[in-house]
Each structure stands twice: as structure tokens, then as C-alpha cells.
Amino acid sequence: MQSGTRWRVLGLCLLSIGVWGQDGNEEMGSITQTPYQVSISGTTVILTCSQHLGSEAQWQHNGKNKEDSGDRLFLPEFSEMEQSGYYVCYPRGSNPEDASHHLYLKARVCENCMEMDVMAVATIVIVDICITLGLLLLVYYWSKNRKAKAKPVTRGAGAGGRQRGQNKERPPPVPNPDYEPIRKGQQDLYSGLNQRRI
């Protein structure tokens, strides 16, 4: 497959993923509205009762009434251990057991967190892979071109351009007497191997 075709296929894949992500968002809009909205910003969690009760709204957390807060319940410095649980919004003066919807909230909050959807994560991963592959191809072609431009190295040409092989004018060098083989008739200390039997 040619490199131009690869880039076209990659662009088509990225485009189809983007369209797929937009289709998912449209489907989410067609779902009926839930009676609660949860907003998390930093360590603050805000629960909104969408029944439009205004100041007549009463909140209950795990069976205990919360202070008067209207249709919005602010939970600053949210603690996952202490403030997670069942929340219910109901009209003041009515029984919370009669409320049609309950909310189970378990959230993890932090100071500098960012919420990312699946499409953002998928886009980051795909772009990272594309950049990595692009750098790999760049280094590959750069090293291939550099290798082709380099001068070939011939062996033996370093000594003034002389050819290899034995020079007919000069005899072979005399062997070094320090490395002569041991003579068979010689009985020196180191003239033979130690043949001690155990």
C-alpha cells in the first residue's frame, strides 16, 4: 500500500470516528429528562431538582433532611465517604417516600480534575499513534537516504591505495622468537604440560 493511500485511509477512519461521536450525542438528547442534574466543579457538587419546585423543594440525604436550599443543593468540599448515598428532592410538607425518583450519588472529586468523554480520549490516542508512526517513518526514510548517500568503504584501501595480498618484493616477516614452539628434546621448567596424576 502506498503512503498516500495510507494517509487517505487514516483520514477516512478519523472522519468516521468523529461522525460516530456526533451521532452518539444526538441520541443522548432524545432521552427523557431526568428529575436531577448533577454538576461537579472542582470539589463542589451541585444537585439540581428539575421539578421546578423553587423554594418549596426539600432535600433528604440517606433519610436525613438537609437544610433549606431550594431546588439546588450545594455540597462544597464533597467527601466521597461521608456525602455519597441516596438523595431525594420532594415538595415541602409531603412524604419523601412518595417521591417518584431517588438519586444515588457517588462521586470522586479533586481540585484540578477535568472531565473527558470517550471521544476526546479516543481522539488523543489516535492522534498520538499517528504522530508516533509519522516520526517512525520520518526517521526510517531519513536514515535510508543518508545510508544511500554515504561513500562505500573498501577494505585495504586505507594504506595508500595498495592492493591486498602479499607483496612479491618483500619476504614474509620473521617469526618472533618469544613465541616459538617448544622443542621436544628440551627439558626446561616450562617446556611441557604438568601431567600429574591424582
Curated annotation (Swiss-Prot):
Cystine pairings recorded for this chain: C49-C89
Domain of life: Eukaryota
GO biological process, one term: adaptive immune response
Annotated ranges, domain ITAM: 169-196
Residue ranges annotated as Cytoplasmic topological domain: 139-198
Gene Ontology cellular-component terms listed: alpha-beta T cell receptor complex; external side of plasma membrane
Metal-binding in keyword set: no
Amino acid composition bias (Polar residues), ranges on this chain: 188-198
Start and end residues of each Ig-like domain: 37-107
The record's account of how the chain is modified after translation: Phosphorylated on Tyr residues after T-cell receptor triggering by LCK in association with CD4/CD8.
Residues that bear Phosphotyrosine: Y179, Y190
One protein family per Pfam: Ig_5
Main localization category: membrane
GO molecular function: transmembrane signaling receptor activity
Signal peptide start-end: 1-21
Region ranges (NUMB-binding region): 166-183
Keywords from the UniProt entry: Adaptive immunity, Cell membrane, Disulfide bond, Immunity, Immunoglobulin domain, Membrane, Phosphoprotein, Receptor, Signal, Transmembrane, Transmembrane helix
Gene3D superfamilies recorded: Immunoglobulins
Subcellular location: Cell membrane
Transmembrane segments: 118-138
Membrane topology: Single-pass type I membrane protein
Its biological purpose: Part of the TCR-CD3 complex present on T-lymphocyte cell surface that plays an essential role in adaptive immune response. When antigen presenting cells (APCs) activate T-cell receptor (TCR), TCR-mediated signals are transmitted across the cell membrane by the CD3 chains CD3D, CD3E, CD3G and CD3Z. All CD3 chains contain immunoreceptor tyrosine-based activation motifs (ITAMs) in their cytoplasmic domain. Upon TCR engagement, these motifs become phosphorylated by Src family protein tyrosine kinases LCK and FYN, resulting in the activation of downstream signaling pathways.
Quaternary structure, from the entry: The TCR-CD3 complex is composed of a CD3D/CD3E and a CD3G/CD3E heterodimers that preferentially associate with TCRalpha and TCRbeta, respectively, to form TCRalpha/CD3E/CD3G and TCRbeta/CD3G/CD3E trimers. In turn, the hexamer interacts with CD3Z homodimer to form the TCR-CD3 complex. Alternatively, TCRalpha and TCRbeta can be replaced by TCRgamma and TCRdelta. Interacts with CD6. Interacts (via Proline-rich sequence) with NCK1; the interaction is ligand dependent but independent of tyrosine kinase activation.
Protein name according to UniProt: T-cell surface glycoprotein CD3 epsilon chain
Organism: Macaca fascicularis
